[in-house]
A protein has these predicted regions:
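Single conserved hydrophobic/aromatic residue that forms the stacking wall/gate
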Residues: 1-12
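Amphipathic alpha-helical "stem/stalk" segments
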Residues: 17-138
Length: 138
């Protein structure tokens, strides 16, 4: 009886992980597609060219970055609950850090919103930023 229920528990856990991975993939795709919005694309090109952003472009990028950070925080929670394995989380964590490479706008967004995130997640983001601090130009 306990072997059967344990086996059933394993099935539910695998199904939960599969559903979680699907949810993560869909959320990632949504954020990626949102980043293809013409306003955001123009703004990203201006950032690359070191050109001044319009107010609309900056606001759009700030909202988009905040959505990305919230999605990553959700992945952090899923990892803590065992829905994401260590390798998947490690990959996501690295991707999170790349958002700050030579990007003072994203750094400013993070510094202004950090207190609204889970403290443990905030510490992870700060560690990822610290590893890339030599990419920031004054």
């Amino acid at each position: 009886d306990t072997t059967w229920s344990r086996g059933l528990g394993d099935v539910y856990k695998r199904q939960g992980k599969a559903a979680s991975r699907q949810s993560i993939a869909e959320a990632h795709q949504e954020v990626t597609l949102a980043g293809l919005d013409p306003l955001l694309m123009r703004a990203k090109l201006k950032l690359i060219k070191k050109e001044k952003l319009s107010i609309d472009e900056e606001v759009g990028l700030r909202i988009h970055m905040t959505a990305i950070l919230r999605a990553r925080e959700n992945h952090f929670y899923q990892h803590k609950m065992g829905m994401l394995d260590d390798e998947e989380w490690k990959t996501m964590r690295k991707a999170l850090g790349t958002l700050f490479i030579d990007n003072n706008l994203n750094l400013d967004i993070w510094n202004k919103s950090k207190s609204t995130f889970n403290p443990e997640f905030a510490k992870i983001v700060d560690e990822e930023i610290d590893m890339r601090k030599d990419t920031f130009k004054k």
